[in-house]
């Protein structure tokens, strides 16, 4: 009787393994199919997180995905980056490289999640190579410290699950301004922007491929270096802050927040100089005395229009743009 039960049990396990293997094969095929998201010469940009440090289920923290051919490049890794990637059916192992604008936590808290979860032996993870990351001074030190902080988890999984050691390593780079990444015709360059006198270095990024150009401002005050860098760009992604004047009077600390960011009018001036094919708002900071802490599209557009009359979009999470001969917004509900 024991042998019969054991035999049935083994057969059940084998059937389960066969099903699991089939699922993994299916996921691999599906991932390969979804990886072909762009055609020759095209770029796809997805706003994964368009919010601020304030927790929101509508707007996760800052993160942008740029897909070029088979490369998937992440810019900042804010809160919820793994959730947004999962919503797009993008396996975490498929991220080619990540780029950090500056060392503020709201741009980084998703890094440990993507790093650790991306190593797990699942259909959406299973990274076998080091996680490649570029960022300002302190990036290498941060990745070393993360490895120490999670050393027990790493030790346990190496021993218990026999996960590939290379998959939990970092290939980290402390960068300066200039060309920081080049692969198969894709170029990523960093340039400094002003987020505050003590927040240095603070990098914006330029992504170029076959004559197409996407510029990311990073967190910034009014800075004409952004306008010069983004002249005639296909897509200029810029931050914006809307702070109730009453709060500025009542809470002097909020003046410091305002002094580190761009108003809609500031951004509009940058857009009017740069003249991109499309200007897009992200990292949207809203501080109000009353009402929901979410952007009033009408207000941000009206204030921007005082300085800029060109194509404009107010970003939201999972908003996508395809860049070929023209810039196509896949969700036009927030274009103006």
Predicted regions span which residues?
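Intrinsic disorder/low-complexity segments enriched in polar/small residues
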Residues: 12, 16-19, 37
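Bacterial N-terminal signal peptides
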Residues: 16-29
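Binuclear metal-dependent hydrolase catalytic cores
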Residues: 34-214, 294, 299-328
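A polyampholytic, Gly/Pro-enriched intrinsically disordered region
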Residues: 330-336
